[in-house]
């Protein structure tokens, strides 16, 4: 959530920043401006009524001695003022709720360093690493490679759960497990604390990280009360672990990692992406989360992105890193890097990780603060990133390491976890 004071102190700055994401957001800014204006007018009216009530209440005692009739009139007026105040105070509460609900639907403001743009066409490539493999044959997509090896079974998955689910078996299941262990071990060596969080969270937890209320249709909701949801990313429980707390600056940065199943309805139409492991309703992902002070978060974003890139370097996969433009960033993000892995069957890079600095946006929603060295209480900055999407990493390995005879070489870094060097 943005700081509501910005709408009073720097309204033009807010408009300019949010319009760089999407000009349609100016409608919500206008609603907040009008609600704030109405709120202030009502508040002034209530304060004036309260002062008048207090003045009359003080005079009643004196008037009772001197002029009982006037005292009676004053008491009637006090009663009328109380009734009017009560009505207006109720109106104030309703306006506060409207302001809060509207603010929850306004995204974070992009950092000034972010390129202004409309969509992914305006994203900026930052760097590339690794060489795409060359083949003496036409490479198959991972779906075909996995099915021929008998390690991916989408037909059975469809019988069990419907479309856009995957069933991994044998070496496919073992490769998935090896990837998760490899990633978690790699991140643990860099100071991240491994966590096994719940995969079901309460509604307010999703409000904290920004999935709700805006993206409710993308979430799998459980029936009954209290309202609970399956997590779409481990960012949700990891970032909320310290909600409502005041941390000491010496404790920062907090660095957390988890490998969890993730659940997303993915209601849109994605063409070829509905085939294979690229865009499923359930998938495994290793997540990175950092809780930072307000000064170091952008340096930590660079470090987190490097940590995610290091996973791909270790696997020998070619990738590129792009900085997202204002129009392509996620709801809670102030700055985002996407890491894209090379997919030979498509002859292009595909997203495998997204690393974001959410500044104080999520912290305000979950009331997560810290006491700085001077003793001042501030909101923390929160960062999150995929370290990385496991299914997409598995897909990239099947495609990049496939051999002409249909076998797949296991990347060296995975062999201690997997136990052999080839899948055939």
UniProtKB/Swiss-Prot annotation:
It is an enzyme of class 6 (ligase). The keyword Transcription regulation does not apply. GO terms for cellular component: cytoplasm. It catalyses: tRNA(Ser) + L-serine + ATP = L-seryl-tRNA(Ser) + AMP + diphosphate + H(+); tRNA(Sec) + L-serine + ATP = L-seryl-tRNA(Sec) + AMP + diphosphate + H(+). It is found in: Cytoplasm. InterPro entries: aa-tRNA-synt_IIb, aa-tRNA-synth_II, aa-tRNA-synth_II/BPL/LPL, Ser-tRNA-ligase_type_1, Ser-tRNA-synth_1_N, SerRS_1_N_sf, SerRS_core, tRNA-bd_arm. It comes from the Bacteria. Signal peptide: none annotated. It holds the Pfam family Seryl_tRNA_N. Pathway: Aminoacyl-tRNA biosynthesis; selenocysteinyl-tRNA(Sec) biosynthesis; L-seryl-tRNA(Sec) from L-serine and tRNA(Sec): step 1/1. Keywords: Aminoacyl-tRNA synthetase, ATP-binding, Cytoplasm, Ligase, Nucleotide-binding, Protein biosynthesis. One of its GO terms (biological process) is seryl-tRNA aminoacylation. Coiled coil: none annotated. Its EC number is 6.1.1.11. PROSITE patterns: AA_TRNA_LIGASE_II. One of its GO terms (molecular function) is serine-tRNA ligase activity. L-serine binds at residues 233-235, 287, 386. The keyword Membrane does not apply. Catalyzes the attachment of serine to tRNA(Ser). Is also able to aminoacylate tRNA(Sec) with serine, to form the misacylated tRNA L-seryl-tRNA(Sec), which will be further converted into selenocysteinyl-tRNA(Sec). Consists of two distinct domains, a catalytic core and a N-terminal extension that is involved in tRNA binding. Homodimer. The tRNA molecule binds across the dimer. Belongs to the class-II aminoacyl-tRNA synthetase family. Type-1 seryl-tRNA synthetase subfamily. This is Serine--tRNA ligase. It comes from Elusimicrobium minutum (strain Pei191). The lineage of its organism: Bacteria, Pseudomonadati, Elusimicrobiota, Elusimicrobia, Elusimicrobiales. The gene is serS.
């Amino acid at each position: 959530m943005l700081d509501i004071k910005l709408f009073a102190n720097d309204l033009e700055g807010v408009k300019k920043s949010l319009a760089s994401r999407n000009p349609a957001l100016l409608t919500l800014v206008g609603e907040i401006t009008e609600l704030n204006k109405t709120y202030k007018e009502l508040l002034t009216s209530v304060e004036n009524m309260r002062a008048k009530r207090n003045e009359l209440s003080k005079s009643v005692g004196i008037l009772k001695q001197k002029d009982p009739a006037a005292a009676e009139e004053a008491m009637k007026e006090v009663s009328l003022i109380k009734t009017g105040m009560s009505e207006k105070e109720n109106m104030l509460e309703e306006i506060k709720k409207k302001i809060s609900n509207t603010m929850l639907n306004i995204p974070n403001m992009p950092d000034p360093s972010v390129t202004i743009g409309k969509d992914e066409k305006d994203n900026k490539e930052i760097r590339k690493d690794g060489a795409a493999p060359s083949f003496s044959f036409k490479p198959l997509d991972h779906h075909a490679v996995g099915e021929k090896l008998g390690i991916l079974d989408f037909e059975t998955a469809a019988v069990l759960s419907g479309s856009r689910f995957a069933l991994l078996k044998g070496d496919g299941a073992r490769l998935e497990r090896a990837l998760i262990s490899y990633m978690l071990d790699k991140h643990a060596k860099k100071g991240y604390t491994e966590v096994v969080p719940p995969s079901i969270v309460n509604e307010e937890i999703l409000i904290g990280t920004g999935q709700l209320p805006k993206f409710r249709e993308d979430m799998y909701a459980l029936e009954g009360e209290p309202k609970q949801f399956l997590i779409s990313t481990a960012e949700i429980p990891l970032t909320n672990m310290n909600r409502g707390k005041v941390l000491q600056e010496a404790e920062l940065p907090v660095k957390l990692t988890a490998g969890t199943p993730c659940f997303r309805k993915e209601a849109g139409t994605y063409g070829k992406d509905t085939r294979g492991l690229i865009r499923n309703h359930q998938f495994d992902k290793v997540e990175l989360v950092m809780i930072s002070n307000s000064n170091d978060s952008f340096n930590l974003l660079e470090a987190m992105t490097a940590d995610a890139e290091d996973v791909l370097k270790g696997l020998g996969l070619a990738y590129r890193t792009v900085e997202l433009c204002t129009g392509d960033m996620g709801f809670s993000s102030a700055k985002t890097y996407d890491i894209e892995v090379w997919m030979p069957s498509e002859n292009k890079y595909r997203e495998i990780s997204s690393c974001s600095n959410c500044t104080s946006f999520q912290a305000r929603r979950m009331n997560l603060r810290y006491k700085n060295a001077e003793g001042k209480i501030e909101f923390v900055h929160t960062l999150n990133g995929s370290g990385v999407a496991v299914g997409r990493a598995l897909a990239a390995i099947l495609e990049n390491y496939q051999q002409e005879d249909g076998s797949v070489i296991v990347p060296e870094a995975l062999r201690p976890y997997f136990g052999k060097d080839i899948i055939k």
